[in-house]
Design a protein with these regions (language model features):
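Short, solvent-exposed loop/turn segments at secondary-structure boundaries
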Residues: 89-90, 136-138, 169-170, 385-389
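Nucleotide and nucleotide-moiety/phosphate-recognizing core
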Residues: 36-128, 136-158, 344
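Small-residue (G/A/S/T)-rich helix-start motifs and N-terminal tracts that mark the onset
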Residues: 1-82, 88, 182, 193-349, ...
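Short, glycine/acidic-enriched loop or turn micro-motifs at the edges of active sites
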Residues: 125, 129, 162, 354-356, ...
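Intrinsically disordered, low-complexity coil segments
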Residues: 99-105, 168-176, 312-315
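Short gly/ser/thr-rich secondary-structure transition/capping motifs
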Residues: 104-111, 138, 163-168, 232-237, ...
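Internal gly/pro-rich beta-alpha loop/helix module
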Residues: 121-123, 128-222
Length: 503
């Protein structure tokens, strides 16, 4: 599913109007019908509704929605803010259509606003400003937003919470953004919905199909997409009836140190649960017995050190290498990592302590083998690119790093972003808070390693691994709830997640 920047959304509307063809007021009516259905599915007609409409097309949507809900038996109080005496043409039309509609108490605010009393059983419909906003709210509109946020009412925003910008909110005034409980987004999501710091404003979000042209959406370019099940499923390679283990790749996992054998075990188990043909785990002697007994399906290769990774190893016989889980940050480990990067010609998955060590030797990132994938969480990424103010800046810096170093990056989070050297960003919708526990990243590393070893292209491997990792977490959460989940549960659910993708 494509995610368009706000600069493209207006063009998307215009192209739909031209190509369908349909008048803009009729497209607004179609959107408002979808909004009315969504409201009616959640709230009964006896629910007190208060609508706040702005002077633009978002306000026009809100006025049309009020009329349609009144026709369904709802009673509404509607406030249209027209302090400058100028409404958009479609907003003006819907103001006229709302006149004398039974069940609507209409107020046009041109000067002083006398706020209504909003109780806990009220639902506020926020239609002040839409995705075209390009500066922070101030003055009277900021005061209205603060009044809404201070009320105990449930807040529903049309398309996007008023005051929130569609992408970059670095310089926004966050106290002047509506805090919605539900955002009804028209046709497609906004990039801002996928950033953690915007959750208090967006709340739950739901997509409403308003019939924008599928041909126009298909033809319009964007660097941002939200992964969908059917698209990820299509990435799976068929397995021949006559295949043998050699057809599914040889993988090398370099992991573990004193007291950190668990990371090796988790990554190895995930790799083996993701279709790899053969797996070797390079470990220090102190981890060898643990790995061999915990993961009997894997082979082990001993490092020269008893306690840590201290010597680079030959990778010519492998189709993919992963390095980092439980590796530690000993001085000899840093030296071995840098040497491993220099001699390795095989795509590498770089995670955890390997990323932390690279943060101190950033010039080595560009020396990673072609097809390599970095899997940082936000703090690990910042060690590579510097401090970031928010998720948007972090994503932009990840794109810059991917382009300059020629690597793929899986920036982990609630909506993990797969960033390509071409600047494309694929966001993953699967996963849940139960996965926010130690070792989850080690499991992801194992899955990515397995797919690279099987010959998947880096972009496809990263998208497929991230999606199935979250899907396995969702299966585990559904079985037992989020609170008691461990990463072992995620590994255990990987086979079912793969099966769900195959069906």
């Amino acid at each position: 599913m494509k995610i368009f920047p706000t600069t493209s959304i207006k063009q998307l509307d215009a192209d739909t109007i031209e190509n369908e063809p349909i008048a803009s007021i009729d497209l607004m009516e179609r959107a408002s019908r979808a909004l009315a259905r969504a409201i009616a599915e959640r709230w009964e007609p006896d629910t007190p509704l208060t609508v706040f409409a702005g002077p633009g097309n978002n306000g026009g949507d809100a006025l049309a929605l009020a009329r349609l809900l009144a026709g369904k038996g709802y009673r509404l109080e509607v406030y249209l803010f027209n302090t400058k005496g100028t409404l958009s043409p479609d907003c003006e039309t819907n103001k006229e259509r709302l006149a004398d509609v039974p069940g609507v108490d209409f107020h046009e605010v041109t000067t002083q606003f006398v706020p209504p009393v909003l109780a806990a059983d009220h639902v506020v419909i926020d239609g002040l400003f839409g995705s075209g906003l390009n500066k922070a709210l101030s003055g009277g509109f900021a005061a209205v937003v603060k009044y809404i946020n201070a009320s105990p009412a449930t807040v529903v925003s049309i398309d996007i919470p008023s005051g929130l910008m569609g992408e970059d909110n670095t310089y926004n005034v966050h106290t002047n953004i509506v805090r919605a409980h539900l955002t009804l987004s028209l046709q497609l999501p906004k990039l801002a919905f996928l950033f953690a710091e915007n959750e208090p404003y967006v709340g739950e979000w739901q997509l409403l199909d308003i019939g924008l042209s599928e041909d126009v959406i298909h033809d319009m370019e964007t660097d941002f997409c939200l992964l969908e099940h059917e698209d990820v499923s299509a990435l799976l390679k068929p397995r021949s009836r006559f295949a043998h283990k050699g057809n599914f790749g040889r993988a090398l996992l370099i992991a573990g140190s004193q007291g950190m054998a668990g990371a090796s075990v988790l990554a190895a188990r995930a790799c083996l649960r993701s279709g790899v043909g053969l797996l070797t785990v390079h470990v220090p002697f102190c981890n060898n017995f643990i790995v061999q007994t915990s993961v009997p399906e894997a082979m082990t290769e001993l490092d020269i050190s008893d306690t840590c990774f201290a010597a680079a190893t030959d990778t010519d016989d492998y189709q993919a290498v992963a390095i980092g889980p439980g590796l530690g940050k000993a001085a000899e480990t840093e030296a071995a990592l840098l040497e491993q990067i220099e001699i390795c010609q095989t795509p590498m998955v770089v995670d955890a302590d390997a990323l932390n060590l690279l943060g101190e030797k950033r010039n080595y990132i560009g020396r990673l083998p072609k097809g390599s994938i970095l899997t940082p969480h936000p703090k690990e990424l910042e060690r590579l690119v510097g401090k970031c103010q928010n998720s948007y800046e972090r994503l932009m810096k990840a794109r810059e790093l991917a382009k300059s170093a020629g690597v793929h990056i899986i920036l982990k989070g609630a909506y993990s972003a797969i960033v390509t050297p071409a600047g494309k960003c694929f966001f993953n919708p699967t996963g849940n808070p139960g996965m926010a526990t130690g070792g989850s990243g080690d499991v992801l590393t194992g899955v990515v390693l397995a797919l690279l070893a099987q010959g998947y292209e880096p972009e496809k491997a990263a998208c497929l691994a991230t999606y199935v990792h979250g899907l396995a977490g969702d299966v585990a959460c559904k079985k037992q709830g989020a609170v008691g989940m461990t990463v072992g549960d995620i590994v255990a659910c990987l086979p079912l997640a793969w099966k769900m993708l195959e069906e």
